[in-house]
A protein has these predicted regions:
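Active-site loops and adjacent core secondary-structure elements that bind or stabilize anionic groups
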Residues: 11-12
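Short glycine-enriched loops at secondary-structure junctions
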Residues: 23-29, 79-80, 119
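Short glycine/threonine-rich loop-to-helix capping motif typified by GTGT followed
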Residues: 33-37, 176-186
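Active-site-proximal alpha-helical scaffold in enzymes
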Residues: 48-75, 114
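Oxyanion-binding "anion nests"
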Residues: 150-180
């Protein structure tokens, strides 16, 4: 029950108050997210965006609320290191050495409640990225593969909104690794 997660909070929210659950993870068929949805009994949109799942869920939630289709949405993402290694790279049991360029998938989860006209952080704009494929196919060096899309999305955001990059404390992307980060900064 969701209300157990909010004990001590000023918000009194129960499962029945939430219109939709939007979530995903890095496992085939988003099984963990589907199991959570089964337990909660909230209408569920399962998404799979790999590194972008959390941001994707928040964007979709904000658009559904702004469009008047919902009043309260729970959006979340999870990942598991061992499962991601098995699925995208090599099973840990093989004992392969990770190269210095490899990213490390977190084992963790997070979720947010998105609602209209509430206090706290707001989703002010949504800029959806495009798939930009430069032909990089090294599963142990995905930063350079993701960097062109990150640059394009950041550029599109500032071009569309006319915001000043200097007015931000941070501009955060997914884990581009050392090489992908350098490509993005250049």
């Amino acid at each position: 029950e969701i209300s157990e997660c909010l004990v001590g909070s000023e918000m009194c929210i129960r499962d029945r108050d939430i219109n939709y659950l939007i979530g995903g993870d890095l496992i085939n068929q988003i099984v963990p997210s589907s199991f959570a949805a089964r337990e909660l009994g909230i209408p569920f949109f399962g998404i799979y965006g790999a590194c972008s799942t959390m941001a994707e869920g928040m964007c979709l939630s904000a658009m559904l609320i702004d469009g008047g289709f919902a009043d309260l949405i729970l959006s979340g993402a999870s990942s598991h290191y061992c499962t991601a290694e098995r699925q995208f790279r090599f099973p840990l049991e093989l004992g392969n050495q990770k190269p210095m360029t490899a990213q490390w998938t977190v084992t963790g989860a997070g979720s947010v409640l998105i609602a209209p006209n509430k206090e706290g952080p707001k989703v002010k704009y949504v800029t959806v990225g495009k798939v930009i494929d430069e032909g990089i196919d090294d599963g142990n060096n995905m930063g350079p593969a993701m960097a062109p899309a990150a640059v394009d999305t950041i550029y599109s955001y500032f071009n569309d909104t006319k915001d000043d990059p200097n007015s931000f404390d941070l501009i955060i992307t997914g884990d581009l690794g050392k090489i992908g980060k350098q490509i993005t900064e250049d």
